[in-house]
Structure formats: C-alpha cells, structure tokens
C-alpha cells in the first residue's frame, strides 16, 4: 500500500475510517471524533494490510507504488482515480497496461460503504490580482470546466460533473463509489 508517513498514511486512515462508517466530528461540533471503536478498527485494517505490503511501505507514496505496478512488482493496489489514468496510458510496459483493470473501491468491516472518499477539483485565483484579472480568470476556468467537448476530449483526466460527459476508462470506479455512498472528502464539521 501507499503508506508513506504523512499524507499517504493519513489518507488511508481516512479511507478506512469512513469505510467503517466513522464520522470525523462529533455531531454539531468541530470536536474530533476518531478515538473510538471505528478508529481502532480502521487502524487494525491498515496494520493487517502492512503484512501484505512492501517491507518499505512507510517510504512508499502513491507514485512509488504506481512505479512498482508498472514494473510488474505489485498485484493489487488502491489508488486515487486521478492517478489511475497514468496506468492506462501509452507509456511503460504495454503488456502490463493490457492486463491492468480498474475496479471499484472495496468496503471494509463487512459494510457496504466503499473505503474511499470523493474529492472534487476546484479552482483558485490569487488574491493579489486585479478584480478584472480575477473575473477574466474565473470566466475562463468556469467556461473550460463546463465544456462537454473539452470533458470528452480529456475523459480520462478526471471525472467531469457536467451534462453530456461520457465517462472514460477511469470513470467507472468513481461512479460506483458515489452510487454506493462514499463520503466526500472531509473538510469541515
């Protein structure tokens, strides 16, 4: 697994905790709520996965695991959808690419909720720009993000939330996760 200390390991906790039905905040508050039975269960799943992982799992981020996959050294991995498209591109060993299949995120603990999160891209505009430049940038970005033609040209770059988008090779697992009740990435209580 991609259990590199820091963000990657933290993200796997997020996946497993939400997959167990955990809530990050106590209801109606900003008080953390992970020191509980579901938090311990998430940690135990991660611990059990390390037994199946590369011995250097604490040094391997998603990119390192993808390199191992493309080298034929990994049989199964959990990767963000945005990173999956590079597994299906024309670079690297085409025999490995031909044998690569994307599957929906699994559930954990006997539940039905996928052990993943949905994280949608957004836009940001610098605060030190003029109002005119900010408005022009916003209009250009929103125009590009709402173009079905552009979305379908880059169907594997991301999953687009616009009318007439025809999902590419990587869209299936995201649609499945959303349909099965995956949580949005936690950002506030």
Positions of PLM-derived features:
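Extracytoplasmic/periplasmic solute-binding protein
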Residues: 1-32, 38, 74
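Short helix-initiation/N-cap motifs at beta->coil->alpha
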Residues: 57-71
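Short helix-loop capping/hinge motifs at secondary-structure junctions, enriched
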Residues: 23-25, 51-52, 129-136
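C-terminal lobe and pocket-closing loops
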Residues: 82-95, 108-189
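Alpha-to-beta junction loops
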Residues: 70-80
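Glycine-centered hinge/linker elements that transmit conformational signals in sensory
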Residues: 28-59, 105
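Beta->alpha turn/N-cap motifs
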Residues: 62, 79-84
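Stable alpha-helical elements in mature extracytoplasmic
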Residues: 9-16, 39-46, 65, 83, ...
């Amino acid at each position: 697994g991609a259990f590199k200390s820091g963000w990657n390991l933290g993200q796997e906790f997020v996946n497993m905790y939400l997959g167990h039905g955990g809530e990050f905040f106590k209801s109606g508050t900003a008080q953390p709520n992970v020191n509980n039975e579901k938090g311990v269960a998430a940690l135990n799943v991660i611990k059990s996965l390390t037994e199946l992982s590369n011995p250097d799992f604490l040094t391997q981020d998603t990119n390192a695991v993808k390199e191992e996959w493309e080298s034929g050294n990994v049989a199964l991995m959990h990767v963000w959808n945005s990173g999956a498209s590079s597994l299906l591109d024309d670079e690297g060993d085409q025999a490995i690419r031909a044998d690569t299949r994307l599957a929906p995120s699994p559930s954990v603990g006997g539940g039905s909720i996928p052990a993943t999160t949905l994280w949608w891209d957004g836009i940001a505009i610098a605060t030190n720009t003029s109002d005119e430049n900010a408005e022009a940038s916003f209009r250009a970005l929103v125009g590009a993000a709402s173009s079905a033609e552009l979305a379908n040209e880059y169907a594997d770059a991301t999953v687009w939330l616009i009318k007439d988008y025809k999902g590419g090779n990587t869209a299936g697992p995201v649609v499945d996760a959303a349909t099965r009740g995956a949580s949005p990435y936690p950002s506030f209580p």
